[in-house]
């Protein structure tokens, strides 16, 4: 029996749950993974320190993908002054299903003076998937954020379209004494009109930013051949990108990160080692 047939047979299954909680603390001049708890196949690898103080961590999603009724929760807490860079070695895959909605909820709390770089691989939604993705960021005064999110509808590299299925995506960023960002994207029935027919959408958020950073980013975006835009909402920079090619989109996000990291964090770019594989 093929993997797709096995997945479709799970329509009567309520799915499984998994959660991962991480707490980062600043100890001396180094950020440490102070505490972590997990249930199910959400895990982390051993932290890396390729640049001294910041803590680089790889989050591992279920290798078999996410199917009907699955519920995944990721909770990240950064203590004051800590700095964590989180990424993933692979994409999050939501397989097709005629069962209950698969849900991924991600919450990030940045205490005063902390820094989070959230740089995951893309979330791939197979045609026929029923998925809900919610990402919430809460920043206290002095916190800094570089975070992107990539949605891949269908598998463009395999010429597979997202011709049916549903996606409910929420992105919420709460800033102290500012409006922040709250946006929701709903895709149903395989209609990609909201994305101009593009199967790939990326959102890159950075805070705190200013007009000079906005102009720097816009100069880079002007070089692209794909639809892209950048907006400054108070001190929150929001960049949106559309594409048909995932590798091109990932390269664009990394180029933006190389610009924004020195501008926002005052640090030179130190790419995660996994990006080179």
From Swiss-Prot:
Paired cysteines (S-S): none
Leader sequence segment: none
Gene: ureD
Job of this protein: Required for maturation of urease via the functional incorporation of the urease nickel metallocenter.
Species assigned in the record: Pseudomonas putida (strain GB-1)
Alphabetized InterPro entries for the sequence: UreD (IPR002669)
HAMAP family according to UniProt: UreD (MF_01384)
Name the record gives this protein: Urease accessory protein UreD
Coiled-coil features, chain-numbered ranges: none
């Amino acid at each position: 029996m093929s993997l797709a047939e096995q997945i479709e047979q799970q329509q009567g299954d309520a799915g499984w749950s998994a959660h991962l909680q991480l707490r980062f603390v600043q100890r001396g001049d180094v950020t440490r993974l102070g505490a972590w708890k997990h249930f199910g196949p959400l895990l982390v690898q051993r932290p890396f320190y390729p640049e001294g103080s910041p803590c680089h961590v790889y989050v591992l999603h279920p290798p078999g993908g996410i199917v009907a009724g699955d519920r995944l929760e990721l909770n990240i807490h950064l203590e004051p002054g800590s700095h964590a860079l989180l990424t993933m070695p692979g994409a999050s895959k939501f397989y097709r299903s005629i069962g209950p909605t698969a849900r991924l909820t991600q919450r990030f709390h940045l205490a005063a003076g902390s820094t989070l770089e959230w740089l995951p691989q893309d979330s791939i939604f197979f045609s026929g998937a029923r998925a809900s993705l919610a990402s919430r960021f809460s920043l206290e005064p002095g916190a800094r954020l570089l975070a992107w999110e990539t949605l891949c509808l269908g598998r463009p590299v395999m010429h597979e379209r997202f011709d049916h299925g549903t996606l409910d995506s929420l992105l919420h960023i709460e800033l102290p004494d500012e409006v922040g960002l709250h946006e929701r994207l709903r895709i149903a029935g395989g209609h990609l009109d909201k994305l101009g027919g593009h199967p790939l959408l990326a959102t890159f958020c950075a805070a705190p930013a200013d007009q000079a950073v906005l102009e720097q980013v816009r100069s880079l975006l002007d070089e692209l051949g794909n639809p892209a835009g950048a907006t400054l909402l108070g001190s929150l920079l929001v960049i949106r990108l559309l594409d048909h090619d995932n590798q091109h989109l990932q390269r664009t996000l990394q180029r933006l990160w190389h610009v924004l990291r020195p501008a926002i964090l005052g640090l030179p770019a130190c790419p995660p080692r996994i990006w080179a594989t």
